[in-house]
Amino acid sequence: MNSEENTDSIPIDLILDILSRLPSKSIARCRCVSKLWESMIRQSYFTELFLTRSSSRPHLLIAVEQEGEWKFFSLPQPKNYLGKSSLVVAANLHLKFFEDKRPQHGCSYASSLIYFPNMTIRKKGDDHLGVICNPSTGQYGYVILPPLLDFKSVPYGKFLGFDPIDKQFKVLIPIFDFDKHQTDHHILTLGAETVGWRKIQSPLRYLPHSNGTICINGILYYLAKINYAMDKNVLVCFDVRSENFVFLRLNTYCSSTKLVNYKGKLGMINQEYVDDGGFPLKLSVWVLEDVGKEEWSTYVYTLRDDNKVDQVKYNLSVVGVTASGEIVLVKKTQTLKPFYVLYFNPDKNTLLTVEVKGLHRGLYAVHRIYAFVDHVEDLEFNIMKTTYAAKSKFSQEDRF
């Protein structure tokens, strides 16, 4: 009896329900069972069902860069650990690929996709390419950057945002014109019928800081400096759908400020080590309660000496906050094994140390770590006209 005959005896809805509970790498294998299964898995109904299931089991996504090679891992975020102070989990390798040019640092994350604005891959050989990747499926596509008019127009950042209403991804590039002393923007809607960059202007002249971005409920947030002397700091709030800007003045700014999703609201976390980069570690948290009224809530937490873990007591960095409010920290430059992730619960004042197995396999030098909290696997990647399959531990035919 072949696979189609087996399938006939099982209700299709039941098959889809079972498949939707599997990880993405297992879904890739299931496509090879039969043409019928492949057809079912590609249906929009199934991709939506899979996304719904995946949303209930968020993961910590980890990207490791070493000399131009990128590897993507995921591991489950701990739940119900009930008094435990340490756990050991295994990292799941999703894919890896190589850059063609010098290694570049920095990326932008939005709704399960990662944008590497300065990355080139040997297949295309174009110096002006960026790469957008779906780490769950192994697919990636190219974003050809807009040509600049002259050397006096300088791009400051290249950001990825997502509009959850129209389900559109957009790339935003702020460009500062030194002659006109103004900030223009190039913006690209991915997957649009008319492909092309558009220009929009900002009501204020500003230069983005290098603290990164975060997109929450269709608003892309990043930090910048304004004024002619560029000596005032603001929070830029860009509505991805309407393409309107709001600027909020900040009374405090630090180069280590991390933008986070704090229970559905924009949060900023500053970290301050008391002694030589070690514990105790002070975390100052600002949560944006109301954009129109510019109302903020503030909290201060301290990870004390009795919280520390000897292997990772120095140079930790905040990478995000889980949906339940736990602050996640890692060492972003790694030379030692094994790899640790720390989850600080501010309500209970507890610190959970998670040792991650399998992350350092094949790594032999200093490498950089990027981590993204509450990553949800998504099978969709229809935002690019042409896509490619990155090298992974699975064969090419197993990729979407």
Swiss-Prot record:
SUPFAM superfamilies named in the record: F-box domain
F-box domain segment(s): 4-49
Pfam families per record: F-box (PF00646), FBA_3 (PF08268)
CDD domains given in the database record: F-box_AtFBW1-like
Domain of life where this protein originates: Eukaryota
Name under which the protein is recorded: Putative F-box protein At1g30920
Classification of source organism: Eukaryota, Viridiplantae, Streptophyta, Embryophyta, Tracheophyta
